[in-house]
Amino acid sequence: MKQLDYLRTVPRSGTGAPSVYLTFDDGPNPVFTPEVLDVLAEHRVPATFFVIGAYAKDRPQLIRRMVAQGHEVANHTMTHPDLSACGRRDVERQVLEANRAIRMACPEASVRHIRAPYGIWSDDVLTTSANAGLAAVHWSVDPRDWSRPGIDAIVDAVLASVRPGSIILLHDGCPPDELANTDASFRDQTVAALSRLIPALHDRGFIIRSLPQNH
């Protein structure tokens, strides 16, 4: 498997300002996804939400809100397993059921991208994604916000690593198998960091854009 089989960064094109891309994994969460959406709306910037299908099924109103606010809803599988430990049929089921759940929640959603749970890719995952018309997207900036390192640490980690074309990984929820851990689902640090990151990125000359449809 080659790294080029999935997108780590978006190549810069044209002569405009350098672009960066905000992405959120593991939602929608009933508490923190609305807060993330509020911050994005305040600053008028787009994002891509890689949602877990089971959550999309249970919280369709949040999927509809994402789409209504101009964000992209993307596939993060149905239940967030390690796909490298799954057989081909299980991989197909995880991907296709998540697509169906998103579209049932919001028929207007155009699902174009997928991110493998834990960023673990395999040939089966890439083949299944391509067959479903989904472009595979990884990331290039990971502040490990899920570990709750502190607001300053999240902001500093992003600003230290961001480059033109960077795909920034953040989290608005947590996987189903981590819900028993009380702290795992808290994304208050991510929300607070986001409200500082967006102006800081703009101050550095970056434009926050939606992921390209074709790449």
Curated annotation (Swiss-Prot):
Its EC number is 3.5.1.-. Its main location: cytoplasm. Residues 18-209 form the NodB homology domain. It comes from the Bacteria. Keywords: Cytoplasm, Hydrolase, Metal-binding, Nodulation, Plasmid. GO terms for biological process: carbohydrate metabolic process. It is found in: Cytoplasm. InterPro entries: Glyco_hydro/deAcase_b/a-brl, NODB_dom, Nodulat_NodB, Polysacc_deacetylase_ArnD. The record marks 145 as: Raises pKa of active site His. A divalent metal cation binds at residues 76, 80. It is an enzyme of class 3 (hydrolase). One of its GO terms (molecular function) is hydrolase activity, acting on carbon-nitrogen (but not peptide) bonds. GO terms for cellular component: cytoplasm; membrane. The active site is at residues 25, 171. Gene3D superfamilies: Glycoside hydrolase/deacetylase (3.20.20.370). Signal peptide: none annotated. Is involved in generating a small heat-stable compound (Nod), an acylated oligomer of N-acetylglucosamine, that stimulates mitosis in various plant protoplasts. Belongs to the polysaccharide deacetylase family. This is Chitooligosaccharide deacetylase. It comes from Sinorhizobium fredii (strain NBRC 101917 / NGR234).
